Regions:
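Secondary-structure capping and boundary motifs in well-ordered enzyme cores
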Residues: 9, 23-26, 62, 101-105, ...
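Internal, conserved structured core segments that host functional sites
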Residues: 67, 72, 76-149
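C-terminal auxiliary extensions adjacent to catalytic cores
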Residues: 166-236
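A contiguous pocket-lining binding segment that forms or flanks enzyme active sites
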Residues: 130, 134-182, 186
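Glycine/small-residue-rich interface belts in oligomeric ring/scaffold proteins
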Residues: 7, 11-80
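A short glycine/serine-rich beta->alpha loop
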Residues: 14-24, 54-60, 94-101, 129-135, ...
């Protein structure tokens, strides 16, 4: 790592925006994280029920765990601790409750890592890629982006909420197509989730691997049941 201070320099901000943009080629538009089944089953049927579902995911479910993985990857990259970074990556890869979540995580992260190496190569990204390849560990998006944020000297307190907001916004976009919702209702849902994003970020910043866990069983169940859903637009 360089000895540059951690701040949100304009160049780092531009890169962070690019990585979290819907235009970044991770294929995130193909995944609904179980929301497609939840809509089909009637658990999500409008903006308010969508907000409730996603807030629970962010505070108690996979969104919370992804935030912790992001923070731990950021810390490990900041400290140049390759063994810790590999441990985080291995745990993140294993911490998938369904086969569709494995697919969703590994395919997006693989595409993200390949693009970062080609467009914004740096030592952190190369080291992470080498570690994962040597140990045949599939990448997880939160780990890739957390480590990359550290490599660009972006403070975790700014990078993490941006990551979680992107996580929620991608799922809102899927729900807009599935329920369906109007575009304005989609933006209202994203706005309503801002406090949940900030709360989840604040919690995760003080958490460690020991705090991983989920109390949002319906999210995992939705993903498992989506695997056998007859008519599907999304891959998860």
């Amino acid at each position: 790592m360089s000895d540059q201070p951690y701040d949100l320099a304009p160049l780092a901000l531009l890169r962070q925006q690019s990585w979290l943009s819907p235009a970044f080629p991770t294929g995130s538009y193909s995944y609904s994280h179980g929301i497609e089944w939840a809509v089909e089953a009637g658990h999500i049927h409008g903006r308010e029920s969508l907000e409730d579902w996603l807030e629970a995911d962010l505070r108690y479910g996979s969104g919370r765990n992804e935030a912790i993985f992001f923070v731990e990857a950021w810390r490990s990259a900041t400290e140049d601790d390759c063994e810790k970074l590999l441990e985080v990556a291995e745990l993140a890869a294993a911490f998938r409750g369904t086969s569709e979540f494995v697919l969703e995580s590994s395919q997006q992260a693989t595409a993200c890592l390949a693009t970062l190496r080609r467009v914004w190569p740096d030592r952190v990204v190369e080291n992470l890629s080498k570690l994962l390849s040597e140990r045949t560990v599939p990448p997880a998006l939160a780990v890739v982006l957390g480590a990359s944020a550290a490599g660009q000297r972006v403070p975790c307190g700014l990078a993490l909420p941006a990551f979680l907001q992107s996580y929620a916004a991608n799922l809102v976009t899927a729900a807009v197509r599935l329920i369906p919702l109007g575009q304005t209702d989609g933006q209202l849902a994203i706005a309503e989730l801002e406090q949940a994003v900030l709360a989840a970020s604040a919690q995760a910043e003080h958490a460690t691997i020991r705090d991983l866990g989920s109390a949002a069983f319906m999210v995992d169940l939705a993903s498992a049941l989506h695997e056998t859903q007859y008519t599907r637009l999304f891959r998860s």
